[in-house]
């Protein structure tokens, strides 16, 4: 199967400062990839290089086997067959929704019957057929983003690029628009690359996620694999919350840390030092009379919240604060048992 997108060893610097450093990844036909990372890690620059708005220093980019950038090739934006949706939509204020969508076809008019049919199909797909005669200033933020997607889809591009398209919307609207836009992409069979800073969004909607840091891709994997088997501590902490401790491995598949001796997931040899990470949902708290226990704790303080209970505990010399979705009613100062569900993650060489 020919990859919908292939990036090989892509690098880009601005004024001798590396922004992209040896980026390589591939995207299957119909796949939705989310690129996540902290601000300034190079996500948007990567999208701009794919679109042709920035020229990489080195590397190759191909779409469905067709080279669009290499040492000897640099196709202009209009010849790359890419759709691009940015944060604010960027619609033409003097054009109606219909004409903005038609602009994606190159002439802004939709002259032929085939073009008009395509425009109407994209308006229907994105749920804005009834808005065809309106101007951008008459639309909500969510409606403007739907128009931007319709315009990007109109010329039937090989790939859609979306740069944080939901970040300017309020939470409730963001959720609805996000679900509708991704459903439209899947219904149209389009491969797409989303840039996002929202890890929950990526975990819920991506087929795969690429985690970036300082111009490099730390890991590309399915949401489940990335969360359960992160390649390193940076990827683990970016994609989800974690409680970390310095630790040392034992020969029996355990590690010694501030909570005592815990089972770990690691193939490193005994004696290896590094960082142990536990996901918050792995913890559960039980009365001291619980039949099984590996971690004995003293409850310091419990604070009920809207969706969870915040509990401060002392385990030996370690003070730990957990947000548990459900917890037994325990008085401050009482002894309790902290149960760990499954092994902790261990990252060699990552010392705190």
From Swiss-Prot:
Residues 5-239 form the ABC transporter domain. PROSITE patterns: ABC_TRANSPORTER_1 (PS00211), ABC_TRANSPORTER_2 (PS50893), FBPC (PS51242). It is a peripheral membrane protein. It is found in: Cell inner membrane. SUPFAM superfamilies: MOP-like (SSF50331), P-loop containing nucleoside triphosphate hydrolases (SSF52540). It catalyses: Fe(3+)(out) + ATP + H2O = Fe(3+)(in) + ADP + phosphate + H(+). It is an enzyme of class 7 (translocase). ATP binds at residues 37-44. InterPro entries: AAA+_ATPase (IPR003593), ABC_SmlMolc_Importer (IPR050093), ABC_transporter-like_ATP-bd (IPR003439), ABC_transporter-like_CS (IPR017871), ABC_transpr_FbpC (IPR015853), FbpC_C (IPR041230), FbpC_RD (IPR055223), Mo/tungstate-bd_C_term_dom (IPR008995). One of its GO terms (cellular component) is plasma membrane. Its main location: membrane. Gene3D superfamilies: 2.40.50.450, 2.40.50.470, P-loop containing nucleotide triphosphate hydrolases. Keywords: ATP-binding, Cell inner membrane, Cell membrane, Ion transport, Iron, Iron transport, Membrane, Nucleotide-binding, Translocase, Transport. It holds the Pfam family ABC_tran. Its EC number is 7.2.2.7. GO terms for molecular function: ABC-type ferric iron transporter activity; ATP binding; ATP hydrolysis activity. Part of the ABC transporter complex FbpABC involved in Fe(3+) ions import. Responsible for energy coupling to the transport system. Belongs to the ABC transporter superfamily. Fe(3+) ion importer (TC 3.A.1.10) family. The complex is composed of two ATP-binding proteins (FbpC), two transmembrane proteins (FbpB) and a solute-binding protein (FbpA). This is Fe(3+) ions import ATP-binding protein FbpC. It comes from Neisseria meningitidis serogroup B (strain ATCC BAA-335 / MC58). The gene is fbpC.
């Amino acid at each position: 199967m020919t990859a919908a997108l292939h990036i090989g060893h892509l690098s880009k610097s601005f004024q001798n400062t590396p922004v992209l450093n040896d980026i390589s990844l591939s995207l299957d036909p119909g796949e939705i990839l989310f690129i996540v990372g902290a601000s300034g890690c190079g996500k948007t620059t990567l999208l701009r290089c794919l679109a042709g708005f920035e020229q990489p220093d080195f590397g190759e980019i191909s779409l469905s086997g067709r080279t669009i950038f290499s040492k000897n090739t640099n196709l202009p934006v209009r010849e790359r067959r890419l759709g691009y949706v940015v944060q604010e939509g960027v619609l033409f204020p003097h054009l109606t929704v219909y004409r903005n969508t038609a602009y994606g076809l190159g002439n802004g008019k939709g002259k032929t019957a085939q073009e008009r049919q395509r425009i109407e199909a994209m308006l229907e797909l994105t749920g804005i057929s009834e808005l065809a005669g309106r101007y951008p200033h008459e639309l909500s933020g969510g409606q403007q983003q739907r128009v931007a997607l319709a315009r990007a889809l109109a010329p039937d591009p090989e790939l859609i690029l979306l740069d944080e398209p939901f970040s300017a919307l309020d939470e409730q609207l963001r959720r609805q628009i996000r679900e509708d836009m991704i459903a439209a992409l899947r219904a149209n069979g389009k491969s797409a690359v989303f840039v996002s800073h929202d890890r929950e969004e990526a975990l819920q909607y991506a087929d795969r996620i690429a985690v970036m840091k300082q111009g490099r891709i730390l890991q590309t994997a399915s949401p489940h694999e990335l969360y359960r088997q992160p390649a390193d501590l940076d990827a683990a902490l970016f994609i989800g919350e974690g409680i970390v401790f310095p630790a040392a491995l034992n020969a029996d598949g355990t590690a010694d840390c501030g909570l005592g001796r815990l089972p770990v997931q690691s193939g490193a040899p005994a004696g290896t030092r590094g960082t142990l990470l536990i996901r918050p949902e792995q913890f559960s708290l039980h009365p001291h009379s619980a039949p099984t226990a590996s971690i004995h704790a003293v409850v310091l303080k419990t604070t009920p919240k809207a969706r969870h209970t915040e509990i401060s505990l002392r385990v030996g010399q370690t003070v730990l604060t957990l947000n548990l979705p459900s917890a037994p009613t325990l008085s401050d100062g009482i002894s309790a048992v902290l149960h760990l569900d499954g092994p902790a993650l261990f990252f060699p060489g990552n010392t705190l």
